[in-house]
Every structure is written in C-alpha cells, then in structure tokens.
C-alpha cells in the first residue's frame, strides 16, 4: 500500500518547450560621458572689483582673486555651486 500523495507536476509558465533558444539580454548599458554638459550657463560671480572700496586695501587694485567661492558666489545656494563644479 502506497501512503504518499501523488506528486503534482510543476511547469513553468514562461518556458516554451520545443521553441528556438535565444540568449537572454541583460539590462541596457549606458556610456558615461567624459565631459559634463550643462543645459544652462554657469553662474557669474556676484561682486567683482571691490579691492579699492575696502579701507586699507587700496594698493591691491581691483583685480583680486577670491579664494573662497562663497565670497564671489554669495548669491547662490551650495547645491548650485556643486552643480557647476565650483565647490
């Protein structure tokens, strides 16, 4: 006497038997560009040429280099500075 229940045959709904075998395609591959291209122009510096307006800095001239980007781009948010690679 056999007490085991009959085994149900499990079939895959997506597999077709007897059809042509094609290799499966993976996810699409994206190529990363070497240079970043922005849709808009990068922001301009806010205050330029204020060397003679500051007391005690008359001899430096108006062509001073700002080291900290927050001084030249103080009208922008940090995420905008990061978007254009300034910081």
Curated annotation (Swiss-Prot):
Root EC class: hydrolase
Keywords: Acetylation, cGMP, Hydrolase, Sensory transduction, Vision
Catalytic activity, reaction form: 3',5'-cyclic GMP + H2O = GMP + H(+)
Basic and acidic residues bias spans: 1-12
Residues bearing the modification N-acetylmethionine: 1
One MF annotation (Gene Ontology) recorded for this entry: cGMP binding
Residue stretches of biased makeup (Basic residues): 26-44
Enzyme Commission numbers on file: 3.1.4.35
Assembly and oligomerization: Oligomer composed of two catalytic chains (alpha and beta), an inhibitory chain (gamma) and the delta chain.
Function, in words: Participates in processes of transmission and amplification of the visual signal. cGMP-PDEs are the effector molecules in G-protein-mediated phototransduction in vertebrate rods and cones.
Protein name, entry field: Retinal rod rhodopsin-sensitive cGMP 3',5'-cyclic phosphodiesterase subunit gamma
Organism: Canis lupus familiaris (Dog)
């Amino acid at each position: 006497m056999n007490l085991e229940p009959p085994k149900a045959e499990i079939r895959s709904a997506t597999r077709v038997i007897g059809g042509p075998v094609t290799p499966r395609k993976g996810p699409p591959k994206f190529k990363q560009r070497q240079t970043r291209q922005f849709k808009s122009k990068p922001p301009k510096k806010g205050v330029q040429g204020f060397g003679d307006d500051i007391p005690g800095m008359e001899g430096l001239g108006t062509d001073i280099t700002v080291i900290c980007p927050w001084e030249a781009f103080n009208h922008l948010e940090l995420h905008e500075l990061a978007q254009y690679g300034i910081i």
